[in-house]
C-alpha cells in the first residue's frame, strides 16, 4: 500500500471517529437531560408520598400558561410504562419505577462514556501516527 493512500485512509478513519465521538457526546447530553427530568419527578413523588392531605399545585398547560389545581388523591399516580401504556400505581411504586429508570440511565451513561473514551483513544492514536509520519517527511 502506498504511503499516500495509507495517510488518506487514516484521515478518513479519523474523521469517522470524530463524528462518532460527537454523536456519543450528544447522546450523553440527552441522557443527562433525561436523568435530570427523572430526578425532578422523583423529588415531586417523594413530596406527594410525605403528605396526607390534598395539595394545591400549578399545572403547566403549555405556552407559558399555568393553572391552579387541587390534587385530591396524591397517593395514586398514572405511570407511562412504555409504548404509550399508562397504568395506575401507588406513589411508592411510582417512586421505585422512576428510581429504576434513573439506574438504567446511569448504566447507559457509563457505557456511553466508556465507548467515547475508546473512540477518543483510537482517534488520538491515529493523530499521533499521522504526526509521526509527517515529522519523518
Swiss-Prot record:
Subcellular location: Cytoplasm
Keyword entries, A-Z: Chaperone, Cytoplasm
A GO cellular component annotation in the UniProt record: prefoldin complex
Family matches, as Pfam families: Prefoldin
GO biological process: protein folding
Similarity section: Belongs to the prefoldin subunit alpha family.
Quaternary structure (record): Heterohexamer of two alpha and four beta subunits.
Role description: Molecular chaperone capable of stabilizing a range of proteins. Seems to fulfill an ATP-independent, HSP70-like function in archaeal de novo protein folding.
Protein known as: Prefoldin subunit alpha
Organism: Archaeoglobus fulgidus (strain ATCC 49558 / DSM 4304 / JCM 9628 / NBRC 100126 / VC-16)
